[in-house]
Structure formats: C-alpha cells, structure tokens
Amino acid sequence: MVIGLLLTAEVSSLRQGYLTYGLGVGLGVACCYVPIVATVGAWFEHRRTLALGLAVAGIGTGTLVLVPVIEQVIETHGWRQAYRLFAVISGVLLLIAAVGARRPPVPSAAPGGVRDTIGGRPDFWILYVSSVFTSACLFTAFVFLADYVDTTGTSGSAALLLGLIGMSSIAGRLGFGAIAAKVGTIGLFRWSCLSLGLSYLIWVIADTSYPILVVFALILGVAYGGIIALSPAVVAELFGTVGMGGVLGALYTANGIGGLIGPPLIGTIIDASGYTAAQLTSVLLGLAGGVMLFMLRSSTPS
C-alpha cells in the first residue's frame, strides 16, 4: 500500500494512476484489512461484535481526521505531497500493527479450505450479491457528493460532509457492535443495509440545503459503520471463525465488484438524467441489498 501511494504521487497520466492507486493501493488494502478483521474476530467470542466495532472504528476515525488535513495539504502543497504524506502515515501505522499483532488461539484456515467452507451454502451467495448492491449504493456518496455540492452551488464544505460520514460511522461501528449481541447480529445487519439505501432519500429531499445534507451524511455514516462492523460478525455467525479470513476475503471481492460497477453506472445516469435519477437508483441498490438479507438465517457452525 505504501509503495502504491508513493508511486501514485509520481504519475503523469490518469491511466498510470489507475494502475498505481487502483491496483497497488487496492491490493495493499486488501492484504491488510482482511487479516486484521479476521484476527480480531478469531480472538473474541462473547463480545466479538463489540471488538470488531472497535477495530474497524479506525476507518471512520481516519476519514474524520485525515480528509480535512489532506484537503489542506492539497491546497498548500499539491496533491503529490498529499499522497506522500498518506504513504508515511500508512507506513508508520502498519508497522505498529504488524509488530503488535498476535496469532489467534484457533486455526487460521479451515482443513478443507474456503471452497469446502462455503461450498453448498446458498447463504454465502446471498451475502455476496447483497454486498455487491450495498457497495454500489455506498460509493455513490463517496464519489459524487463533492461534485454535487460544487455543481449545484450548495453553500458549504464537501470535505466536512465526508468528514461527518466518517465521524458518524464511528458511532455506527461502536454502537451497532455493542448492541448486536443483544438484538441479533444478522437482524441488525439487515437494517443497517436498508437504512443505507433509505438515507439517499434524504439527499433527494436536500436539494441545495446544506443542513439537510449534513443530516444525510450523519445517517449514511451510521448505517455504513454498522455494515462495516457487523459483516465480519455475520460471517463468523454463519460460517464459524476457523478459516474466517478466507471467507471474508472471498466475500469482500463483492465489495470490489460493487465499487467497480456502481460509480460508472451512477455517473452515466447523472450525465443522462441528472442527480435525482442517480440518487433514486442508489436507493434501489441499497434496498435490494437489504431485502436479500431476509433470506439469511442464523446457523453458527459447531
């Protein structure tokens, strides 16, 4: 990931950026995130959802803290320096995590591998397709919210809105993680996905009202945080913690597909029909992802 960020700082064309950031940083994130989440999930049993919520709260904290900082760095020193700063911060934090990590007291891989763990399990594919829809919905805000604020002439900071998404996602990760054990992990996960889709209706209503956009960012962030915190716990509940990293790795490719398909689709709709049609499409994507989860049932393997 550090190498990808440093190389991105040196690109001279957008195509090079696709390679260095999309492939380099993308592979780095995948190699870091999945093992970290799987390790935390394997270490804890009784308070797994809370532990996972705490672990992934760092993503929201990073969004909250670094977005305004990087925006300022770009304005004063340029985007190349911003990527270099990201590389340094990432390298230091990853080194600390690598030194402090310990193997969990359970086998790291299932005896038969991922294929045997998810083979013949329709619930995995329900989760997979749901994640494609949900990710496509989520990335609409991350990719197009700043452009929307600029295009519509809305009076307010787009960076602040993205920061609020990160801040409220921390509350979602911690809050949903804490209460999931009491109300049911899968049920709470369903409603997180449904809430994500429904939040885009607030964006439709907002038009150029910045205060309503703030409400949208906060609700979206809470729902997003719940999804991030609960998805590994759902995997642990359905498939167990043995080989959890492999199952999560397979499942998270759905997020990549959603992120790959969603923004171009939404961008095409914006160009053809405007933002309202794109926002409503995001509503449908989020609702589709949430509704599919009603086909899941809790079945923790022994």
Regions found by a protein language model. Give the residues of each.
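C-terminal transmembrane helical hairpin of 12-TM major facilitator-type secondary transporters
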Residues: 157, 165-169, 175, 183-234
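Extracytoplasmic gate region of multi-pass secondary transporters
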Residues: 122-178
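Intracellular juxtamembrane helix-capping segments at the cytosolic ends
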Residues: 30-44, 226-239
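Helix-loop-helix hairpin linking two adjacent transmembrane segments in secondary transporters
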Residues: 54-55, 59-102
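A membrane-interface helix-boundary motif in multi-pass transporters
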Residues: 72-88, 268-285
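A late C-terminal transmembrane helix in Major Facilitator Superfamily
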Residues: 224, 238-275, 282
